[in-house]
Amino acid sequence: MAFDKYRSTVPVELSDRTWPSQRLERAPRWCSVDLRDGNQALIDPMDPERKMAMFTQLIAMGFKEIEVGFPSASQPDYDFVRTIIEQGLIPEDVTIQVLTQCREDLIRRTYESLHGVHRVIVHFYNSTSTLQRRVVFGMDMDGVKKIATDAATLCKSLESTSPETEFVYEYSPESFTGTELEYALEVCDAVADVIEPTPEQPLILNLPATVEMYTPNLYADAIEWFCRHVQRRDSVLVSLHPHNDRGTAVAAAELGVLAGADRVEGTLFGNGERTGNVDVVTLALNLFSQGVDPELDIRDIDKARHVAEYANRLPVHMRHPYVGELVYTAFSGSHQDAIKKGMLAIGDTYDLWEVPYLPIDPKHTGRTYEAIIRVNSQSGKGGVAYLLSTEHGLDLPRAMQVEFSKQVQELTEQTGTEISPSEIWDVFTTTYQPENATIQLLSSEVTADQHNTRIFAQLIVAGQHVTVKGEGNGPIDALMAGLRNEMDVDFKVRDYHEHALTAGSEASAVAYVEAEGTDGSTWWGVGMSSSILDASLEAVISAANRRR
């Protein structure tokens, strides 16, 4: 690896940093850039229908600032801005944002697109990075700064073209992470001198990690230094715009907020140039999982995903935090066992969510518990038992869980694939209640006095009708005696469990019998019926069919 072709970047030496001792206790201001930064990164940019679907979804989720396009860069973006203004589709409490480069023709075209809007953020930018000044523009620092201040002056002068509109300004020194920190500050302060913000009408200074160039802690150092030194701090909103080139955009945003930033721009599930923008959904749900109101409504995360996938024509990864198909799923046996016990411990109602391996309750994002546990060859008894409990109301005794999980594992090892809940049920019924069982209980008559219980049971044995009579100290013991005397079926009942059924069957009771053969081997039988007596007798017959 040619690592010697690269060098580390340290934006500032900040030995007295304070951000590590801060905590995230409230949500920043959110701005979605799905319709602009996200859209420009797509293989196939959104058509009007997809843009509208995304815009509607962002409003439903509670975004109050939405960057809706780059109207001077393309006719479709211009038309979309005009559509949502002319059709009155922007709620009173939502501010749209439009992007423009610091070029006079583009700024004028941008203002033309805004006639009739009640409030708008005009976001103008130019690249200030050392590399782009040298390689792209061939300009010195003063020349690049003048581009920014000239744009600010023009923007202010064009306010008169839309007297009904409240204008808010945002300036980005693009490639902030590749710009000398003192120079980025100098340019931002110069822009602020033109805009003349106040605490009531602040200027947004957006500090993009246009390319993520260093670790999140260094980004936080840069943000804290900037917040300390920027003029008019009480009249400035410091905004973050992290990209994910190093895979740490979420961490960079979180540490940047700790360092003093007020606002974050990002996209749903991180769509954006190259490796993407910061994922606002992950940021919001990270706050949520720590007991902080995210100030976004993500109670139907699957709908948000479906809209994003439709609009972007890109899939959301199965492992994507909070939203991926598998993020609430455990295949590992030990994980499944811990989840099963955790779910039982908190019950249906709880004050505080505490379940192993599940950082949040899936129901809080609109998910169900259905996919929490899925079974493959890595799974153990806990996962199988959990699915039988949730799908069919069965509470298998622990020893029976071990026995049956081996049956399931044999199948998963043979196929090498996941096994579905319905397939697990098929294995269960085939094992314990097969339709073609050798012995089948047709009916029974039980009588008892103070000394004994007697049973007359009508059976079908290998297709032949058989009557079994037995006597014992209870119905199970009596049936065992009858089977032993008349059919030479010899085993004893080692353990017995029963419970009412709550789901998944027309039967109302289930019984489990652990049988022990004369050689010391053990196995289980299961019976289900409308009465607990019949269920217990069915369990004995099940064990008799499975005798080893």
Question: Which role fits each region the language model picked out?
Answer:
Residues M1-E104, R367, I372-V375, S379, ...:
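N-terminal capping/small domains of soluble enzymes
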Residues M1-R36, G291-K469, S505-V510:
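A mid-to-C-terminal "edge-of-domain" accessory segment
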Residues S521-W524, M528-R548:
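Mixed-charge, glycine-accented linear interaction segment located at domain edges/termini
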Residues T447-T453, G463, K469-S521, S530-S531:
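A conserved regulatory-domain signal marking ACT and ACT-like small-molecule sensing domains
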Residues F3-D4, W30, A41-E65, V81-Q87, ...:
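Alpha/beta enzyme core
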Residues Y214-D348:
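Catalytic alpha/beta core domains of metabolic enzymes, predominantly
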Residues Q132, L207-A209, L237, E265-E273, ...:
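Short beta-alpha connecting loops at secondary-structure transitions
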Residues D37, A41-L42, P71-Q75, S129-L131, ...:
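Short, small-residue-enriched loops and turns at beta-alpha junctions
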